[in-house]
Amino acid sequence: MDGNEIAHAKKLVYDLYSGSLSPSAIAATEKELQKAQRSQQGWNIGLFMLQSKDVYEQFFGALTLQMKINTQLETLSDKDLVQLFVQLLQKLLWDDGLPALVERKVICTLASLTIKYELEKKEEASLKVIYCLFCNKLEFFNADMNAASVLNNLFPPASSRNAQLTASYINELLLELSFSIYTKENEDALFNNVFRPCSNIIVSVLVFIFTNYSLDLSKEKNVAALEEALNCMIAISSYLAKASVSVQSVLPAFTECMDLTVNCIALDEVSEKAMNCLADLLANYSNFITQPTIERLWTILTGPWGETHLQQELEDPDSGEENDYSFLNIVIGFAEAMLPQIIDHIQEEKSIRLLYILASLLSFPGYAIVEEKVSWRTLEFWTTLIEDFSMSKAATDPSKDEIFKQIAFSVVEKAWWKMLLPSPEQWNSWPSSSRDSFNSYRRDLGDLLESSYSIFGERLYAMYITTIENFFSDGTGSPQSLEVSFYCLCCILEYDTNDSDTLDAWLTRLFETSFAIKASAFQNPQLLKTCSQLLSSCSCFLQNHPQYLNISLPVLFDALHISETSIQMTVSRSIHTLCTTCASHLLTEIDGFMAVVEELTPKLVYVPSVLEKIYSSVGYVTQRIEDIELRISYLMRLLNCILAQLQPSLYPNLEIFENVLKSCLQSVAGVALSQSPIGESPIIDVEQSTQETTFWQQSCIAEFQAKLISFLTHSESMALQYSDVVGLICKIMIAGLNEVEPSPFSLPIVTTIQYFCDRFTEFPAAVLLTLGSAILTCPYGQTDIIDKVLIDMCSSIQNSVVIINEESFMNNIDITVELYHFFSIILQKHPSFLETMYPDFTQLILNRAINLLGKPERLLESAAGQFIISFITSEKSDLLNTHTDFVNAIRSPLIAKILLGFGGNASRSSLPLLSDILGKLKAQNFSATRACLTQSLEEEGFPSRNVSNEIKRRFLTDLLKARIKDKVKQFWILCKGLESTPYGNSSWTF
């Protein structure tokens, strides 16, 4: 042994734990220690330090040995391996004063050694280790023994400390099996070679500890042994769940351990550990716990012991006492496991007492944010219970139904209190994470109310609306209590979407209180936000009772003056909902509506989504105006209002102006979308439409569209970068093109075509190609799309640098996807155009489309594949020979690409598309396709070397049939070498 290396390692350990090193020096020292561990002297360093009297040296020695075991065990001889086992066992058995830190690390090292040894040497070591630790008989490690002989001679243990050491070792062994790096190596070998041989002995040890040491907890080692046994129970549960094996088939004796664990729950010294253990067991193995044990646990939880712990759970969280929610875990775990029994026996005292405990947990003090876990975790149980009960047979039993409703209604009442917002000052003091957490919890409480509505119905409306009426009549409540009643109503209105006389009557009572106006008087932002949500939820009611609109919308517009984005967004969504639902009732208010919008626009240009909602809202109202000239006059006012904001001098810098510009364009896009015609029949005959259609000849339409084009041109010229605005401009144009009948935003086809051609060459953007596709599919103006127009559009595309350069073509995925979509439409609408006017370009994009098949970019592959299908199937009776020549030219490379995909070069998701293309080729020319398939599959090793020529011959026969999906799947699996894997044997299809 090199004494210098040992001394150097000892100094490094001393320096590392001395607390005198800087962070950089600590990193350097750790690096030096790792180098020493990896060296040839690492084994000697570990063994030498393990015998030291210094705690940190002992710990480092065990750590070094564990590292060497995990990475370099093969460097030890069989004799050295046995000696290493003995030395680790000696450390545990002969050193009574071993510090807990060192003891745990030595046990971890021993567990790692056991697993590695049994995997590589295929010899049992865990049985011997358990026997030596339990019986304190080190000399028996070299003896021949099996599971039967160990069981016959194992009991009793030498001492409670030996029992504790054994349980600690079992726990670490199971943890290593579950989480160590070796689980990836061979999970089946770990289960069969390590766990299974000693599993019954493990259970026997645990049964002995639970049975004997729970009787006398005055001894510290007895308590320690019980705690380790409980840790083992959690570890076994975790490992069996991870290994996906049945307790009943693999470890039936584990049931006895679970039963005995219940006895520990009432033992103060190990109660919390036992509760956590049982919560874990109930989550995974509740069906294996015997009924007598379940009854015993039920009695404990609902008896004096449970009541005491419930009171502890409900203590003030600011009292300074730690609470790890062990009682909550066990109660929730037990209640979830017993859910069917609770429902079936809801009238029994034990069920009622358990449910009242769970209801009480919703009264946990404090706000339900991240730090408050009690109410949060209880909520999910109640939501599930209410839903399950409402669908059970018990709900049809009047006595059971009445008992359950009494308990559940108390939960609903507690939910109201739990939803209460804090004061504005406290709310603003919370970090955003806490506010988000609270809002998330409120949404979960809303789910509870929705579930409760299925059993309570009108009773919930009565409770919340009566509470609101009393609030306004008494005048003594807080804004928070009013807000939470609004919120609860929102929740159940989302659930109850059906109109009914009962609902109508209750909402009439609600609106008769003028709640919106009275709520706005508090000037409480959160109250106004929830009030706006409630108005939105009542949109269908307001559609049938428009008299309440004039006292609702003004409140919402006033709320937009609150300079808080989240509130503005909520309010704008509510305005949008009311305007889309009740537009026809708001025509008389249009002038006031417009005035408010004009006033708010300068303040809202900084919040694009809000401004868009407001503009599209007024757009929906104007769309209901039958007089086209009057309608256009309001649209002109909106456009002029937007134009007034586009003055750079109004803003501190150009960057802010650029954002305002985009906000304004987004708002105009919202107006454009709002102008969708609502009539069932178009005002023009789509089939007979001509350039002379009177719609565009109306002076008001022509004037508005001239103004719109001027606005778009002006916006382009003022943008710092065209790329920032092109998407919004195209969105405005597309909104007009997508209508069944033209709207004021439906620019003439020739205008949009000219815009496309002028812009695409210098700025090839995907959204421009989307515009091109919209032009081709527009239901009117198609007579304007003559060959010259198509030539102009295709020439703009052909001359684009992005299209010419193959690398750019492949890298700009969004452009390429839209390009193939555009050309697919041309093939459908104008079948012979591409081959006649652009034969070389057509061949180019076809070849590139073939190359894209099998690519991982799914959207790109799909677009290219659909283009190929459109090309093959397009009808070209006037150019049949030319089309046949084109298809024949691509047939061979296309089939080769398809076969490569079938042969494993494409992902599973590509197989349906490739199969579809092959089907179209067969339909177009079966004999030519068969010849290409035959020639390709005769090539040696093509498309994969994993399949024989005989398999390929059978596959060729299969491909020539009508139904090929199953055969393609089988061939793909064989080529990928997956036939023996679970994935290959699974039942997936396409």
UniProtKB/Swiss-Prot annotation:
SUPFAM superfamilies associated with the record: ARM repeat
Record keywords, A-Z: Nucleus, Transport
GO biological process, one term: protein import into nucleus
Gene Ontology molecular function: any one: GTP binding
A single cellular component GO annotation: nuclear envelope
Alphabetical list of Pfam families matching this protein: Importin_rep_3 (PF18806)
Subcellular location: Nucleus
Entry's transmembrane regions: none
Task performed by this protein: Functions as a component of the nuclear pore complex (NPC). NPC components, collectively referred to as nucleoporins (NUPs), can play the role of both NPC structural components and of docking or interaction partners for transiently associated nuclear transport factors. Active directional transport is assured by both, a Phe-Gly (FG) repeat affinity gradient for these transport factors across the NPC and a transport cofactor concentration gradient across the nuclear envelope.
Family membership: Belongs to the importin beta family.
Protein name in the entry: Importin beta-like protein kap111
Species of origin: Schizosaccharomyces pombe (strain 972 / ATCC 24843) (Fission yeast)
Source species taxonomy: Eukaryota, Fungi, Dikarya, Ascomycota, Taphrinomycotina
